[in-house]
Amino acid sequence: MSETNSTADSRDVVLRSSIDRSLRHPVMFFFTSGAVWLALAIVLGLVASAKKHSPEFLTCFSWLDAGKVDAAHMSAMIYGWGLQAAFGIIIWLMARLSRKQCTAAGVILWAGHAWNAAVFYGVVRIMMGEGSGVTYMEFPSEVWPVLLLCYSVITIWSLIQFQVRDAGHVYVSQWYLLAGLLWFPWIAVTAWVFVFLMDGHPLMVTGVAAWFKGTLFSLFFLPVALASSYYLAPKVTGRPVYSYNIALFGFWSLAVFGPWGGMQKLVGAPVPQFLPYAGAASMILILIPAIAVGYNIIRTVIGNSEVVAESPSLRFTAAGIVLFIVFGVLSVLLHTVPAMKLTQFSYTGYGFDILGLYGVFSLCAFGAIYFIVPRITRREWLSRRFIKWHFYCSLYGVSSIVLCAVIGGVTQGQGIEDLSQPFGTMAERASQVGWGVTLAWAFLLIANLFFCLHLLLMWARLGRRSSHPTLLKAHHPENPHGPEGEVDNYSSASA
């Protein structure tokens, strides 16, 4: 019996190694190019934030005007970093969970290069003043067909791997991956058609753009982050997911509430009143999947606090899940009728967006990257100090942005609503908030310079040649990354 088990384990190791080897180049390409785009996006965010409280900053460069640099900043973060990090996570996770090698690595790699070229072209056009001006869809109209084609070429192979997998259970992570893979083209094509192809009323364009902005996070970035979390939590701890039923409830609650978000941005606009309030209700109800997922993941890792503290992947993932719960709580507080009157035209919305994109998605993506990269490069991370600095500076930076923007935005909104005060008083309040946000972006820049450098060194295969993972504390005899066999993250553990 032991000899049979040993043979099965050997075959399993060979299969995992072959899967990792087949995906090494495309996955590392997406992670490293995404990290470079993230560093650029943070630099642009630093400049955009500085211009809000110091308008004379860099006025000698017309291509760094406030409107241009702000649009380029968010576009680089979403399409340069966010989508590419998601691509790397999706194709690796789906291959591992489907237990199928990738046979189209070259095609995926070429599509990745085309994606980067399209994003670069779009960012340059924005900074030349030739963007569309549509929120989260700032790229010129000719860029979107290229991006949609590249997306199809990159992700179709993951759907094929799932289809041809051996019969068996569908993992919790695969629910979210499949949902995100299918939801993104739906929302992207719908928004592209209504915004760029149909000659509709500008108010329709504004509404569709607001819907796209809300659903891009809830129906793509969030499912990818949760898929990664549901994979890493049982994998690193060596325990199954706490409750299958809670996982199912969290998935379907996100699927039901997520598509309604976004329209809350149109409160007070001349649109049917049920639209913005349906969007606000959706954002309030997002607390339900946040609590369900947070409770499930926390109960999965509870009792393994030492593993969470030592494992880079699990530490980032746990931080991302906690911030997802914070995101849900803030959704409730900021989308009531009295709150929306104060936050509609203030810093608050920006802070809330950064909490979702960086606090939830990016931290979970960092956790996945710290887990995946050693397996596809066959090298361990060089420095635990780099990882620690990346974690603490990231957590401090994103927390500071959210606190400054949300709290400062509410006081800014109160100043706008108080007609007895001069407008200059409100502008002074906004300026004080801007300084805090700018300082926080500086911390994020430091964090991601460490991350980008570390990742580039791993891509060059300059990591440590060791069978022991790089831990955030001194090494101990147990492996905090768990056994390399597939952990059943579909079955329910006893309470």
Regions found by a protein language model. Give the residues of each.
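Short, intrinsically disordered terminal tails adjacent to the first/last structured region
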Residues: 1-12, 474-495
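Cytosolic juxtamembrane amphipathic/interface segments immediately preceding
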Residues: 12-27
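Hydrophobic cores of alpha-helical transmembrane segments in multi-pass integral membrane proteins
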Residues: 27-53, 66-100, 104-129, 142-162, ...
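Non-cytosolic membrane-interface motifs at loop->transmembrane helix junctions
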Residues: 133-144, 169-173, 204-212, 272-282, ...
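Alpha-helical transmembrane bundle and helix-membrane interface signal
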Residues: 164-167, 239
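Short, flexible helix-coil linker/hinge segments at the edges of structured domains or between repeats
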Residues: 195-207
